[in-house]
């Protein structure tokens, strides 16, 4: 069996792992591709310490982002209901539908915080009334907001 070499990835490589991972690869792969193109570095004790420090910083930053998402979720809950005005035809049927972009604009107007419309899931809304939309604020944090559609 061929000897394997341990290297530390300096950027994400699709078949191996992400930045900072220690992986074992064939010597030729490391020597001819990973090392010359700067995608990896040889494993040394100092590099391992750098990786540990970097991972600790990333973990702290991720916890901070998660806490901000939780705080924003509570802010949305205290606001309670967002109102969206749309034109209505006869029989209370809307011209068009209420989209996730409309919900994002209503939330941004009330909270002054940008939300990506792709993170909002809105049911099909074709009538006036109250509805619930789901917002993914973080990988582990979701919120539900009440939407009232008026004319």
Swiss-Prot record:
InterPro entries: Ribosomal_bL9, Ribosomal_bL9/RNase_H1_N, Ribosomal_bL9_bac/chp, Ribosomal_bL9_C, Ribosomal_bL9_C_sf, Ribosomal_bL9_N, Ribosomal_bL9_N_sf
Record-linked PANTHER family: 50S RIBOSOMAL PROTEIN L9
GO cellular component terms given for this protein: ribonucleoprotein complex; ribosome
PROSITE patterns for this protein: RIBOSOMAL_L9 (PS00651)
Domain of life: Bacteria
Protein name: Large ribosomal subunit protein bL9
Record's keyword terms, sorted: Ribonucleoprotein, Ribosomal protein, RNA-binding, rRNA-binding
HAMAP family: Ribosomal_bL9
Signal peptide per UniProt: none
GO MF: rRNA binding; structural constituent of ribosome
General function of this protein: Binds to the 23S rRNA.
GO BP annotations listed: translation
Family to which this protein belongs: Belongs to the bacterial ribosomal protein bL9 family.
Record Pfam families: Ribosomal_L9_C, Ribosomal_L9_N
